[in-house]
């Protein structure tokens, strides 16, 4: 029997113009299983060698920052969230670390506290809030204060096109401008406002239109993801609502009518053969914890 297990969903961020604010939880998952106490932290995983197996692992280091008095444990980590592909892999690790500290340290953190802590670590609420809450989230970080609203989007299907190449978030952010002209900011924020209103009112065609009209980041990142325009064109022809970069990229995120997601995914897979086409769903549960026979930890 598993003593303690934690499951954290992947996430996509921005949804076009909702830069560092809008996030959606996805049906790819990071799992953490706590095995037993140990004299030092040990992380069992089958990822690449660059992922630490000790207290330098992001999950463990996050947990120890949240609760420095934690006793070391052996944990096993598995995940089908692609690394450095714009699907919230680091955010899911941060969220898992916070929950690990919460459970082992008996901190009794509220959901709002978890979102606040995770946002402070990540620097923006979109990915981490989606992974904690599930569904679609709209968040804002003002200084140290985080405000998040969660909405349901059960009528939507999701497709992700994942390239073989990695793209580091820092590299993707390096192409963004340091200064944004006032008139461009007005235009960009208006589009983002309509996106959020359309999400809340379930006006999916408007959502699709707005998510393809971003001015904040996608125009600058096109040089790093040159296939985006052709994928966007094909997806629309196949019946999708809209297409955008997933987070900082390089993955592409597509919203579809729920009942058409499989058909559209199959059509895209036939065209873009160099990319992995994943038919996904929006995760509506967020982080989950299984504490069966969690004794003596």
UniProtKB/Swiss-Prot annotation:
> Pfam families of this UniProt entry?
GHMP_kinases_C, GHMP_kinases_N
Q: Which residues bind ATP?
A: 82-92
Function of this protein? Catalyzes the ATP-dependent phosphorylation of L-homoserine to L-homoserine phosphate.
What the record says about family reads: Belongs to the GHMP kinase family. Homoserine kinase subfamily.
Q: In which pathway does it act?
A: Amino-acid biosynthesis; L-threonine biosynthesis; L-threonine from L-aspartate: step 4/5
Sorted keywords for this record are: Amino-acid biosynthesis, ATP-binding, Cytoplasm, Kinase, Nucleotide-binding, Threonine biosynthesis, Transferase
Sorted alphabetically, the Gene Ontology BP terms of this entry are: threonine biosynthetic process
Q: What is this protein called?
A: Homoserine kinase
Any GO MF annotation of the entry:
ATP binding
Predominant place of localization: cytoplasm
Q: What is the lineage of its organism?
A: Bacteria, Bacillati, Bacillota, Bacilli, Bacillales
Subcellular locations according to the entry: Cytoplasm
**Which reaction equations make up its catalytic activity?**
L-homoserine + ATP = O-phospho-L-homoserine + ADP + H(+)
Q: Mind telling me which GO cellular component terms the entry cites?
A: cytoplasm
Which SUPFAM superfamilies does the record match to this protein?
A: GHMP Kinase, C-terminal domain (SSF55060), Ribosomal protein S5 domain 2-like (SSF54211)
């Amino acid at each position: 029997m598993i003593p303690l297990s934690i499951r954290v969903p992947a996430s996509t961020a921005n949804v076009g113009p909702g830069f560092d604010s809008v996030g959606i939880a996805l049906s790819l998952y990071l799992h953490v299983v706590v095995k037993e106490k140990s004299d030092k932290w040990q992380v069992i995983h089958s990822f690449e060698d660059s992922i630490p197996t000790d207290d330098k692992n992001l999950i463990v280091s996050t947990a120890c920052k949240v609760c420095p008095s934690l006793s070391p444990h052996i944990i096993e980590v598995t995940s089908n969230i692609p690394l450095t592909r714009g699907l919230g892999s680091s955010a899911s690790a941060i969220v898992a670390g916070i929950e690990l500290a919460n459970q082992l340290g008996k901190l009794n953190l509220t959901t709002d506290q978890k979102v606040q802590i995770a946002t402070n670590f990540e620097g923006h609420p979109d990915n981490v809030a989606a992974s904690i809450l599930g569904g679609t989230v709209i968040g804002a970080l003002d200084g140290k204060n985080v405000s998040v609203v969660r909405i349901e989007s059960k009528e939507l299907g999701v497709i992700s096109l994942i390239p073989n190449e990695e793209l580091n978030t820092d590299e993707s952010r390096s192409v963004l401008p340091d200064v944004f002209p006032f008139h461009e900011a007005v235009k960009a924020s208006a589009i983002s406002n309509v996106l959020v209103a359309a999400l809340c009112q379930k006006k999916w065609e408007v959502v699709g239109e707005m998510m393809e009209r971003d001015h904040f980041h996608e125009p600058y990142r096109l040089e790093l993801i040159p296939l985006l325009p052709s994928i966007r064109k094909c997806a629309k022809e196949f019946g999708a609502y809209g297409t955008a970069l997933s987070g900082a990229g390089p993955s592409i995120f597509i919203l579809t009518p729920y009942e058409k997601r499989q058909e559209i995914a199959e059509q895209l897979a036939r065209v873009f053969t160099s990319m992995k086409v994943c038919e996904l769903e929006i995760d509506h549960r967020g982080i989950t914890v299984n504490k069966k026979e969690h004794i003596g930890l």
